[in-house]
Each structure stands twice: as C-alpha cells, then as structure tokens.
Amino acid sequence: MALVINDRVKETSTTSGTGTLNLAGASQDFISFVSGVGNGNTTYYCITETGTDKFEVGIGTVTDATPDTLSRDTVISNNLGTTNEIDFGSGEKEVFCTIPAVKAMSPVMNPTTYVVTHNSTLSDDQ
C-alpha cells in the first residue's frame, strides 16, 4: 500500500528475537501504529531496547490484528552499524515512527533543484 509517516506514533513491545513485533498498544499521550499509519501501510520505524544501547531503524509494515504487528521489512541502520535485524532480548522495547537521517533532506538544500542519486552524499554545502 502506501508509505505513511506520522507524528506521535509510539507503542511498546516485549517481542524478542529478529522477527515481526507484536505491538502492545499506544504509549501514554501517543497514537498507535494502526491509528497513525494504517493497516497494510509501511512506515519508517525505530526500535529501542530499554536499558541497552540496542536500536534498529528501518521500514516496516503495519498489520491490524490481535495483537497488532509491525514487520521489519528493511533495516536501514542499527547500533552495530549493519543493515541486519537486531536480535532483541526479553523486556520492553519502544517502537516509534521516525524519519531516518539518510532519508532526511538538510534544511539548507533547495528541494526544487537537488537530486538524490544512489551515490549522493548529503552535506550542508549542497
């Protein structure tokens, strides 16, 4: 379906391992992935494991189910500096929508003239 990015989308999960995350509902004062992104849509996500330096940023697909889930389709970055799924341990993880740094345009760039190619390097000089 569509790539959807939304503000204030955040849930928790206790799923361990490298697979699809079971989502535990919206964190206080936030909205759920199903409400903010929508069933079947993809989004950029970040997962952080409480009490550790583990994190993963990627693109995932939201599924409205019991429980709601977020698949980890493409990993963009992680704390190991690779594009592999992080093997999260037991315990709580925070999962939220984000825009990965490699996908963000610098505010000093002119979006009408700047073209990103597969080999582009972004800097404030552009």
Language model: regions and residue ranges:
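Elongated alpha-helical scaffolds
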Residues: 53-71
